[in-house]
Amino acid sequence: NSAHPCCDPVTCKPKRGEHCISGPCCRNCKFLSPGTICKKARGDDMNDYCTGISSDCPRNPWKD
C-alpha cells in the first residue's frame, strides 16, 4: 500500500530508518519493545510477547 506512512511507494518495503509497516508488534513504523504483550492470555493459555526485532507476535514457547 503506497499510501501507508511506513511504506516506500517504490519498493513496498519499510522506508529508510523504519522497521516495519504493520503487524501486532509494529507501531508507528517501529518494532514494539521486547516484552510488550501482543496477545493476551485466554483460559489456560499464556501471554505472547513481542521480541523487539520483528513485527510478528511469536507463540509463547512454553505453551503446550
Swiss-Prot record:
Free-text tissue specificity from the UniProt record: Expressed by the venom gland.
A GO cellular-component term linked to this record: extracellular region
Keyword Secreted attributed: yes
Disulfide bridge positions per record: C6-C29, C20-C26, C25-C50, C38-C57
Residue intervals passing through the bilayer: none
Pfam entry (one): Disintegrin
SMART domains named in the record: DISIN
Motif Cell attachment site, residue range(s) on this chain: 42-44
Function: Inhibits ADP-induced human platelet aggregation. Antagonist of alpha-IIb/beta-3 (ITGA2B/ITGB3).
Family: Belongs to the disintegrin family. Dimeric disintegrin subfamily.
Listed name of the protein: Disintegrin CV-11-beta
Origin organism lineage: Eukaryota, Metazoa, Chordata, Craniata, Vertebrata
